[in-house]
């Protein structure tokens, strides 16, 4: 599943394609959304926001399209009039004079009014977004030590969108490798230096992944600077200590780590 950096890059691409341009055609696959097609003709996208792995497309008439790609959803940008070559099922089409954005295969799609947006169950439940520039390590540290999260093992906590939105499995293992911790630790057991390092890594690594334009594709992460230290590198040498990277399962997800330098 794409994680926060990949969702944010998708949002950037959508904004670059159609932001501020009048919509000339709108199509939704789901019957409950059909009524909005005519309401959106002539309107424009004001901005595309991410909340963790959810994407919010805001329109000039104050409606917002909520979509969560889950495992299979994908947005694509094409020139208007061009057919996208895919076997995926089209769910959403937003067309302007020169560019069209298409959402395929997703099933979690809703149109929300401003009032509904504030009350949406997922958006109410989700924690601060790791890519939000206003989120600081100090706030992250407060969340780590809060009664709600301080007794949770990191193996599960770092996958919980209620803790911090946008984290996922590759970020989980890379963050824990960076700070030299295993997944069975809890925030309440860390010393001050460990807490400080973890709070910074929880923001620095997702933001570094996003900023260096890496792409997750077929279990590889291709980017100018960001590269995996442990994710999908089981059996290889750890660049920090020379130990052998291992793979296990934690919180029902593959977990990659180095026994030599993660304790």
Curated annotation (Swiss-Prot):
Its cofactor is Zn(2+). Pfam families: Fapy_DNA_glyco (PF01149), H2TH (PF06831), zf-FPG_IleRS (PF06827). GO terms for molecular function: class I DNA-(apurinic or apyrimidinic site) endonuclease activity; damaged DNA binding; oxidized pyrimidine nucleobase lesion DNA N-glycosylase activity; zinc ion binding. The active site is at 2 (schiff-base intermediate with dna), 3 (proton donor), 53 (proton donor), 253 (proton donor). InterPro entries: DNA_glyclase/AP_lyase_DNA-bd, DNA_glyclase_Znf_dom_DNA_BS, EcNei-like_N, Endonuclease-VIII, FPG_cat, MutM-like_N-ter, Ribosomal_uS13-like_H2TH, Znf_DNA_glyclase/AP_lyase. Binds 1 zinc ion per subunit. It catalyses: 2'-deoxyribonucleotide-(2'-deoxyribose 5'-phosphate)-2'-deoxyribonucleotide-DNA = a 3'-end 2'-deoxyribonucleotide-(2,3-dehydro-2,3-deoxyribose 5'-phosphate)-DNA + a 5'-end 5'-phospho-2'-deoxyribonucleoside-DNA + H(+). A zinc finger (FPG-type) spans 229-263. Its EC number is 3.2.2.-, 4.2.99.18. Keywords: DNA damage, DNA repair, DNA-binding, Glycosidase, Hydrolase, Lyase, Metal-binding, Multifunctional enzyme, Zinc, Zinc-finger. The keyword Flavoprotein does not apply. The keyword DNA-binding applies. PROSITE patterns: FPG_CAT, ZF_FPG_1, ZF_FPG_2. GO terms for biological process: base-excision repair. DNA binds at residues 70, 125, 169. Involved in base excision repair of DNA damaged by oxidation or by mutagenic agents. Acts as a DNA glycosylase that recognizes and removes damaged bases. Has a preference for oxidized pyrimidines, such as thymine glycol, 5,6-dihydrouracil and 5,6-dihydrothymine. Has AP (apurinic/apyrimidinic) lyase activity and introduces nicks in the DNA strand. Cleaves the DNA backbone by beta-delta elimination to generate a single-strand break at the site of the removed base with both 3'- and 5'-phosphates. Belongs to the FPG family. NCBIfam families: PRK10445.1 (NF007763). This is Endonuclease 8. It comes from Shigella dysenteriae serotype 1 (strain Sd197).
């Amino acid at each position: 599943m794409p994680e926060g950096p990949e969702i944010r890059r998708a949002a950037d691409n959508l904004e670059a394609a159609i932001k501020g341009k009048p919509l000339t055609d709108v199509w939704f696959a789901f019957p409950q959304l059909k009524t909005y097609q005519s309401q959106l003709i002539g309107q424009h996208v004001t901005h595309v926001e991410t909340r963790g792995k959810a994407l919010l497309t805001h329109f000039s008439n104050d409606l917002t399209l909520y979509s969560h790609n889950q495992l299979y959803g994908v947005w694509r940008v094409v020139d208007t009039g061009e057919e996208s070559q895919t076997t995926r099922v089209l769910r959403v089409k937003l067309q302007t004079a020169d560019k069209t954005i298409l959402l395929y295969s997703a099933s979690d799609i809703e149109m929300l009014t401003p009032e509904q947006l504030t009350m949406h169950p997922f958006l109410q439940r989700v924690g601060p977004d790791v890519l939000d520039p206003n989120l600081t390590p100090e706030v992250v540290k407060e969340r780590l030590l809060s009664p709600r999260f301080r007794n949770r093992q990191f193996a599960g906590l770092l996958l919980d969108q209620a803790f911090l939105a946008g984290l996922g499995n590759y970020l989980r293992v890379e963050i824990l490798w960076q700070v030299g911790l295993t997944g069975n630790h809890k925030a309440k057991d860390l010393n001050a230096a460990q807490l400080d390092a973890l709070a910074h890594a929880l923001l620095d690594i997702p933001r570094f992944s996003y900023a260096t334009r890496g792409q997750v594709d077929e279990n590889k992460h291709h980017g100018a600077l960001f590269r995996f230290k442990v994710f999908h590198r089981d059996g290889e040498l750890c660049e920090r200590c020379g130990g052998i990277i291992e793979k296990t399962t934690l919180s029902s997800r593959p977990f990659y780590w180095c026994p030599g330098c993660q304790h």
